């Protein structure tokens, strides 16, 4: 069996229990070497074959998978965070499907969750934002025009941006053009949950200068929105006057 496993955002102990078990049982592990914490490879058994996909093409990755499957081996394709976000797993799965090779997907903790933990923040605050936009700036991989930063910014929802650290000046321009104020709270979270994690609070207008000052050029998430401010409405969920399926509200 081939299993796509989410390694989590960085810290070794943030891989899921299932992911940890699959890693321990694997005969072959192909890991995203540029992003996955190498400490996780200590879980692999002694004779496990380990491949760093940072140095491989899609065809080379598939060749290892196909041969391993033919030899009856358990294979783990270890991706950073949760593979469903910017993990390039669809093209691998489609090729395996064509070859009628079975595979499964083991979800992981995404780095955008790790960033929230680093910020000690909640992305959905009553009266502020109940939606989260996960997106990226267009780079070598284009972004559909209908999904432009400017169009998303018009909603004033919480935004979490992947793969955009090297384009922060342009990002600020697009956010402001879409409707955010330059003073809107923002944050840069470098390597969330890793030992070298760094959190930088700033504003939409100071994203680029903050990253330059802190010498951050990659491996960071950008969070934008008023949820990073201090004012919000209390949640109804635990309000004494609010009735739920499990608790009757009281008059206050």
Feature map (PLM): residue ranges:
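A generic local structural motif
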Residues: 14-18, 38, 62-63, 120-121, ...
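Predominant activation on well-ordered alpha-helical scaffold segments within soluble catalytic domains
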Residues: 20, 37, 41, 66, ...
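Short secondary-structure boundary/capping segments
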Residues: 20, 42, 67, 124-125, ...
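Structural recognition of alpha->loop->beta junctions
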Residues: 26-27, 96-102, 126, 208-216, ...
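A contiguous loop/helix-start segment that scaffolds small-molecule binding in enzyme catalytic cores
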Residues: 2, 71-75, 131, 139, ...
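Class I S-adenosyl-L-methionine
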Residues: 1-109, 114
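Class I SAM-dependent methyltransferase SAM-binding "motif I" and its flanking Rossmann-like core
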Residues: 84-155, 198-201
